[in-house]
Amino acid sequence: MDYSYANVVPNFRLDGRLAIITGGSGGLAAVISRALLAQGADVALIDMNLERTKSAAKEVLGWGEETLKGEHASAIGQVSAWSCNIGDAEAVDATFSSINEHHGKIADLLINTAGYCENFPAETYPATNAESIMKVNGLGSFYVSQSFARPLIQNNLRGSIILIGSMSGTIVNDPQPQCMYNMSKAGVIHLVRSLACEWAKYNIRVNTLSPGYILTPLTRNVISGHTEMKEAWESKIPMKRMAEPKEFVGSILYLASETASSYTTGHNLVVDGGYECW
């Protein structure tokens, strides 16, 4: 048995790697992109609104230049911004190809945070809304995974896919009437298992990170002035609080690392403060 430092202590550095983050202008992507940049990765942000995504990319790079000084200065990578509807397979494929060409390397880390939730009672859920959320959350997760994996397979390169699921993919969180969101996230979790089995032979690991309630800017706006809603949510969490976005960074770095999680694939990592325990 080799007990050398490198063989025992996991390495979370991402030097030389290119990470694609969908939903790139969102609250969760903001902290994830900074963490990946700090670990030496190049980062490509994708979202629907190009100007908002460019602004997010500029903020991330500015943060890197200000924060990663001294011994880490040389580790600051590139940050690029792209516009794409992940529910459009052809657009996804073209965007991923452009990203690889722009950065001069093939992306080997994908983090899909894109997706949305909406509430309608099941008996009155509009068909067009149901189709739309399944196209983005469900098919979009497949399209980005497919376009990411193809060049890796063609060039015999390894990679890691992290699809953001939700605790709502395995439980029904009362009192929100969000059956189609729950269905879409359940689909993401099982998609991950399927892709993990198919692509293990190509050294492409596929995992789900399923959050509970996160205090993103959007969530803060929703609960602002609604004390009863906030208290109702938190009462069902054993830790009695919602998560800060930064509390998901460790899980992302674990699943991204080729040493820490080299034998982890097809897994649904739930980070929910214990919500599912009750």
Curated annotation (Swiss-Prot):
Presence of the UniProt keyword Transcription in the record: no
A GO term, aspect molecular function: D-arabinitol 2-dehydrogenase activity
Entries under InterPro entries matching the protein: NAD(P)-bd_dom_sf, Sc_DH/Rdtase_CS, SDR_fam
Pathway involvement of the protein, from the record: Carbohydrate metabolism; D-arabinitol metabolism
Record keywords, A-Z: NADP, Oxidoreductase
Enzyme class: oxidoreductase
Pfam families in UniProt: adh_short_C2 (PF13561)
EC number(s) stated in the UniProt entry for this protein: 1.1.1.250
Catalyzed reaction equations: D-arabinitol + NAD(+) = D-ribulose + NADH + H(+)
PROSITE patterns: ADH_SHORT
GO BP terms, alphabetized: arabitol metabolic process; carbohydrate metabolic process
Residue sites binding NADP(+) per the record: L28, N49, Y181, K185, I214, T216
Gene3D superfamilies found in the cross-reference section: NAD(P)-binding Rossmann-like Domain
Active-site residues annotated for this sequence: S166, Y181, K185
Family of this protein: Belongs to the short-chain dehydrogenases/reductases (SDR) family.
PANTHER family assigned to the protein according to its UniProt record, in alphabetical order: 3-OXOACYL-[ACYL-CARRIER-PROTEIN] REDUCTASE FABG, SHORT-CHAIN DEHYDROGENASES/REDUCTASES FAMILY MEMBER
Identification of the protein by name: D-arabinitol 2-dehydrogenase [ribulose-forming]
